[in-house]
């Protein structure tokens, strides 16, 4: 695509790979060389990794699609000399600007905002190291990118193509040996999950232990004639989710099914809209989330009629109800039928689906109202133990730590207590 007075700089889609080129018309008599700019999108429908013959026996040789285009780019611009060509990629601001207080229909508003995401502000420009300065200046001006948001990449841009190589035949040496998750010693496949939970709480550690009991918990609840209701929060689920299928089946079987599908789950908004509609069509009561907040908790409540009582079964987890990522991500979960957990789980869903704000909790703490205070009191408790000569230690595992109050409290406790804190992202 050429760029000049009549052909404006095109919309470059987020994270697509493109090639920028500087051109000069051949056989011009002008003393001053006039430069033209063009951009070529690397086709996303073609394999980026192209295998070519190798001179060495049993060796595999590959070339990238953008390298093929670069070597032959002159064929796209007849009667023009290609002075230089370099690949580049942009990233756009993916935040959705939603005025939830004014939005009459959150689902429709998010759908509208998703269409506008492709026009988001460019927040990162990646270029190949050694790019021609004239070409870089042109890209910077047209894309309106700040100097600090330009990244010169040594080697190929966007390394996700390496996953394709990982899966190719003959590349076994690039792969770890497959890991088979262990069964939880308290759970035998095919057994009644509710009977097992009644015997005692069950702790799960994924991916070292299989996620199957969680999937089976929802599946059995959907078909169990004694189950009256299922309530669940969903943030991210797999592409062909057995949990979604079980929830839909439960509603079709006449059970009361309430599901909070978080429509504002970053980069899963479109998927979650699809799942929300599917669950609604099956007869589930679907909640789209709370105004001004993201519901990130992972909790399931199953209400079951047993002899002369109603018993509540609860699953709590640190990870998504996603049977695919549960094979990779380190998370913990717990099944329980203890009354106090059941009462708290009921209170959570009453908050999510209605107008309710409990003042007292038995076991659970929720952000943003109570969780920070709970952690601060636990840190203070360990400090008091240390001051009084009792054993004191803090072990905290988290994705990220960015709350100023918690950070300050941990620093304050560090002089008294040994703190182990594996943090996945940032601190």
Predicted regions and their residues:
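Phosphate/diphosphate-binding loops
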Residues: 261-329
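Conserved short loop/turn motifs at secondary-structure junctions
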Residues: 124-131, 231-238, 260-268, 395-401
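Signature of lipid phosphatidyltransferase scaffolds
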Residues: 59-80, 88-90, 301-376, 380
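Catalytic-core regions built around general acid/base machinery
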Residues: 243-253, 275-279, 409-416
């Amino acid at each position: 695509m050429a760029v000049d007075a009549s052909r404006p700089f095109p919309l470059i889609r987020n994270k697509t790979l493109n090639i920028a080129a500087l051109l000069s018309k051949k056989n011009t008599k002008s003393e001053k060389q006039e430069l033209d700019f063009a951009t070529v999108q690397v086709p996303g429908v073609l394999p980026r990794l192209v295998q070519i013959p190798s001179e060495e026996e049993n060796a595999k040789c590959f070339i990238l699609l953008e390298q093929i285009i670069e070597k032959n780019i002159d064929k796209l611009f007849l009667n023009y000399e290609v002075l230089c060509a370099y690949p580049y990629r942009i990233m756009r601001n993916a935040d959705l600007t939603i005025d939830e207080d004014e939005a009459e229909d959150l689902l429709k508003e998010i759908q509208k905002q998703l269409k506008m995401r492709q026009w988001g502000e460019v927040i990162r420009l990646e270029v190949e190291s050694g790019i021609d300065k004239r070409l870089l200046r042109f890209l910077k001006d047209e894309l309106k990118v700040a100097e600090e948001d330009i990244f010169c990449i040594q080697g190929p841009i966007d390394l996700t193509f390496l996953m394709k190589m990982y899966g190719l035949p003959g590349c076994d040496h690039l792969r770890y040996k497959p890991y088979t998750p262990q069964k939880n010693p308290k759970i035998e496949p095919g057994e009644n999950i509710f009977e097992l939970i009644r015997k005692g709480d069950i702790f799960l550690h994924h991916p070292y232990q299989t996620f199957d009991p969680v999937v089976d918990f929802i599946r059995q609840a959907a078909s169990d004639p004694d189950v009256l209701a299922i309530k669940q929060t969903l943030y991210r689920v797999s592409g062909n989710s057995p949990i979604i299928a079980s929830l839909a089946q439960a509603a079709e079987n006449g059970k009361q099914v309430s599901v909070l599908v978080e429509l504002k789950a970053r980069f899963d908004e479109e998927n979650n809209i699809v799942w929300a509609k599917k669950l609604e069509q099956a007869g589930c009561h679907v909640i789209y989330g709370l105004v001004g907040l993201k519901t990130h908790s992972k909790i399931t409540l199953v209400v079951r009629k047993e002899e002369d009582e109603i018993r509540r079964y609860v699953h709590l987890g640190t990870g998504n109800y996603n049977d695919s990522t549960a094979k990779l991500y380190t998370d913990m979960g717990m099944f329980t039928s203890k009354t106090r957990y059941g009462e708290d789980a009921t209170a959570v869903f009453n908050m999510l689906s209605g107008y309710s704000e409990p003042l007292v909790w038995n076991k659970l703490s929720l952000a943003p109202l109570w969780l920070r205070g709970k952690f601060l009191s636990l840190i203070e408790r360990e400090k008091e133990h240390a001051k009084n000569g009792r054993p004191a230690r803090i072990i905290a595992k988290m994705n990220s730590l960015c709350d100023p109050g918690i950070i300050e409290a941990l620093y304050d406790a560090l002089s008294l207590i040994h703190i182990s804190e594996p943090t996945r992202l940032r601190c």
